[in-house]
A protein has these predicted regions:
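Residue-level signal for pocket-adjacent positions within structured domains
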Residues: 89, 97, 168-174
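Terminal helices and disordered tails flanking the catalytic cores of nucleotide-processing hydrolases
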Residues: 171-196
Length: 196
């Protein structure tokens, strides 16, 4: 499974949405976010000298990390919109507002969808836990952590009109992995990603 296949999958899913939903949820900006997260997650893993196969997984997981939002946009647009508004008004992570409204977050729905599609388990895990990587059983830095970091950096620096509130990066968690000192370099990598 290659990054190009991830792009084809996301483009296919995004293209099935009705035009009003594309505008309401700023789907073009969401696609751009997913691309930046894939690029940055790969760069983060590369900087930490993870194996080449993990770099590919990071790219694919980053590109697909918000696939569950497509389920929400297409099947539960009003509930999802209310979750976004609730998130903004309460400064509460949007994935938590989704869970309250629908008993599942976009991350969990995305992981389930990718599992149904038969994608590799490291991609499914990264998508499912990209907001809460500490719930995984790993005790060393992983692709899931890279997608978590890349997504939050991009949300912080490039938020769009259909975003909910995003929590800050959990520095204590990064300290437990021994990588908190890398934040400045990851922010520079993000800036370079924007220039591409």
């Amino acid at each position: 499974f290659k990054a190009s296949e991830a792009l084809i999958l996301t483009n296919g899913v995004f293209s099935e949405l009705p035009e009003p939903s594309i505008r309401r949820f700023c789907v073009d900006q969401l696609q751009e976010h997913c691309m930046r997260v894939g690029t940055l997650a790969r760069a983060i893993c590369n900087g930490l000298h993870l194996p080449e196969d993990q770099l590919d997984v990071a790219s694919m997981a980053g590109i697909l990390h918000d696939a569950g939002k497509m389920i929400l946009i297409s099947s539960f647009p009003d509930e999802y919109w209310r979750s976004i508004l609730e998130s903004r008004s309460r400064y509460f992570p949007v994935f938590g507002a989704e869970r309250q409204a629908l008993q599942a977050s976009h991350a969990e729905l995305g992981g389930y969808l990718l599992d149904l599609w038969g994608l590799p388990s490291p991609i499914i895990e990264a998508v499912t836990y990209h907001h809460e990587p500490w719930l995984c059983s790993q005790s060393v830095f992983s692709v899931t952590d890279a997608v978590y970091i890349a997504s939050l950096i991009d949300h912080e620096r490039q938020s769009n009109l259909a975003d909910g509130w995003s929590e800050p990066i959990n520095i204590e968690y990064l300290q437990s992995l021994g990588v908190a000192d890398q934040m400045d370099s990851w922010l520079r990598l993000h800036k370079a990603t924007l220039a591409e």
